[in-house]
């Protein structure tokens, strides 16, 4: 396992959501034959050769391409992790509690003060408020304490040679080789997540190439060892997605009794219209009269918190296309800036659905004439829309959430 350069900042400690370092070293091991020697799956060598030629054609130097690709190994564990995405089965309560907790809030506030000069510079140049920058940093790498230990060239080659998302990861691999080619980091030090995300803010290689900057003036775009480079790059990336510095990400709100939860379907309405429906802020005060649109989000259904998501919520989702993630970033930023906990925390007893649960739910909806999309075990917009329609037709709260009442009505055991 490669040793990380000494310059890397190491604030904070690993959270419960991260794996023990000994196990992590196992994750990066290649496929081994019975005698312990490295063994590649059939066709992998040919795939590597094709990718090397593609990289050279795309402008990577022959020297870099050949040297890096000669050291690439197939990582079977990467394929396993690519097939198993925990975002699909965790509850909102579990997700939020793991990512926005007192320890992380306290550390974030400490770092907000420690790096106030740097963060103020990033805010001046990009428009990104400091608490959001620190929140992204906290969620991505626990404030720089863990960047991932997978060898990025090997991870990306493994994924590029897998047919499921070959085109996407081929592009990422070529971008990673270009990053090495420009001298940002030596190939043997390019470590990251199993999917190839790198550095303090976990940029994918294509995002790195387009948005990473040299903010400390040392001639390199170094997102591993330079916090100025990492923070400014994060600011530039979010700025490129039209972050609106005049408004926050959104806010927790209170809904009136007998509210029509079918409105929480992604539609964006003027804030004044939500106000006229009786929605208030989390403390019962009237919403501000601002000329902006917002969408209502109820990530844990009608039993959990409700949020009005503004334009910047969509910008956050441009970084990570998960509503859970976007809420976590916004809420953590609020907490770091001094706000308190949610007024209506998510229910701890919500059922945690497996892929099998969701597939059975999707099939049950199909059998009843609804259109949840292909039964793939993913709670996407089509599935939520079908749930909402089923709920409305069966006198259930139409929040689009697969709670116990929906599972019972569809005769699906929660533990199935």
Residue ranges and their predicted role:
Residues 1-10:
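N-terminal secretory signal peptides that target proteins for export/translocation
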Residues 353-358, 366-410:
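Short acidic, glycine/serine/threonine-rich helix-capping segments at coil-helix boundaries
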Residues 410-416:
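Intrinsically disordered, low-complexity Ser/Thr-rich linker and spacer segments
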Residues 47-54, 118, 155, 361, ...:
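A general alpha-helix detector
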Residues 42-62, 66:
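Mature N-terminal segment immediately following signal peptide/propeptide cleavage
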